[in-house]
Swiss-Prot record:
Family: Belongs to the RnpA family.
InterPro entries, alphabetized: Ribosomal_Su5_D2-typ_SF, Ribsml_uS5_D2-typ_fold_subgr, RNase_P, RNase_P_CS
Pfam families in UniProt: Ribonuclease_P
Reactions it catalyzes: Endonucleolytic cleavage of RNA, removing 5'-extranucleotides from tRNA precursor
GO terms under cellular component: ribonuclease P complex
Function: RNaseP catalyzes the removal of the 5'-leader sequence from pre-tRNA to produce the mature 5'-terminus. It can also cleave other RNA substrates such as 4.5S RNA. The protein component plays an auxiliary but essential role in vivo by binding to the 5'-leader sequence and broadening the substrate specificity of the ribozyme.
Lineage: Bacteria, Pseudomonadati, Pseudomonadota, Gammaproteobacteria, Enterobacterales
Gene Ontology terms for molecular function: 3'-tRNA processing endoribonuclease activity; ribonuclease P activity; tRNA binding
Species per Swiss-Prot/TrEMBL record: Edwardsiella ictaluri (strain 93-146)
Record protein name field: Ribonuclease P protein component
Amino acid sequence: MVKLSFPRELRLLTPNHFNFVFQQPQRAGTPQLTILGRMNSLGYPRIGLTVAKKHVKRAHERNRIKRLTRESFRLRQHSLPAMDFVVIVKKGVQELDNRALTEMLEKLWRRHCRQARAS
């Protein structure tokens, strides 16, 4: 049985972890969302989230976006390549409903999987 938990090891926690991804990222994005990824040597994917107050004013909207993003990652973690991902939220994402945001994330995860196989 495959574990679908989201332990601490699957998160980017320090600024050094984020900077590692920002140095040489593979990008997949839409006007509302960008996912940066960089291969790691750990053998499993990790995720970090950046949801700026500048782009999403209300805390409950920021929390909703982070919750849906973490859930999407948690469900796909075993099909994703061993990469560190940083999800960057841009203006306009709060207008998306939950279904549209989830579908957008799925599309971006698939794009990263294709890019990882190609490289």
